[in-house]
Amino acid sequence: GWFSGVKIKSQDGPLGVRLIVNVVPNPILKKVELNPKNSVISNEYVDDIFNNYYGTTLNLNEFQNKIEIIKKRYEKLGYSLVRVSGPDRISENGVVTLKVSDGIISDVKIRFPDSDGEFVIDGKPRKGKTKDWVIKRELKTQPGSIFNRKILEADIGRLYATSLFDDVKVSLGPDNLNPGQVIIFLDLSEQRTGSLTGGL
């Protein structure tokens, strides 16, 4: 983890072949930057994690351990789709760039499956009795925002609290038009309404 390159040369000599090993050490770590800079991961937190390593020779094994600490913290905060990879780039002056993918939500699709789990009838999406705006007003999870599992769980709780739904299932899918982004599918089973009971 300490070296960025190793070159081995052989040289014939009177006593046989002599191996010359030249190692190129990693640069002194001066700064860790994020790409993109406006990530959910704060630069202050990254500096706190790497502060004790600034001014020392970069050790890529220790560096990867610190990246794991960052990933675990953000997963604990609910940002389970945040991906940190790298180092993406190591400059000669000791600035290391990490690539961050925040897990942006590109769309939230509401679906109403029938009893067989089908979403389409005669080539058209199956519609529910509940209007989309009634559902969307309960959702803090919105297109363009960063996926957060805790916020989505609270959204599901609010949907159940309306007493309009028997079941709420969530699935995630990739957005093929926007790599790195995700589509959230909300599959809603509506409560049966209008039941009448009576007796004598």
What is each of the regions a protein language model found here?
Residues G1-L200:
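Periplasmic polypeptide-binding modules associated with outer-membrane biogenesis and secretion
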